[in-house]
Amino acid sequence: ESLKAAGLPLRRFKTGTPPRVNARSVDFDEMELQPGDALPVPFSYGTQSPPENRAVCWLTWTTEETLRIVRENLDRAPMYSGVIEGVGPRYCPSFETKVVRFPDKLRHQLFVEPMGLNTEELYIQGFSSSMP
């Protein structure tokens, strides 16, 4: 509100950033564990010792209910209501774009990735959205 009061116009931008969720709110029993490489290869030839690969990810899928909710609320999505204009990324479309572009798919794959080794924050890869 203070930015508006200062005369700065506010709007949504297409950042393509998926939501973050708290790991304490996630049922990992419903997901498939995706461990890292047993012998991870470092990015640099200058790495003296192999990195410790302690972080794990999980694979999960959206449900038909998720797709229904998105379809029923597309008019609220700034990318589909005209609030945000422009073309989104080709290879990482928003979730609502996947729902529109692939109407025959009953589910979409998501990867749940830790944001770091010492945080409860998780990144939901494949779930970027402009939905409110």
Set out the residue ranges of the language-model regions:
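An anion/pyrophosphate-binding glycine-rich loop and adjacent beta-alpha core
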Residues: 2-131
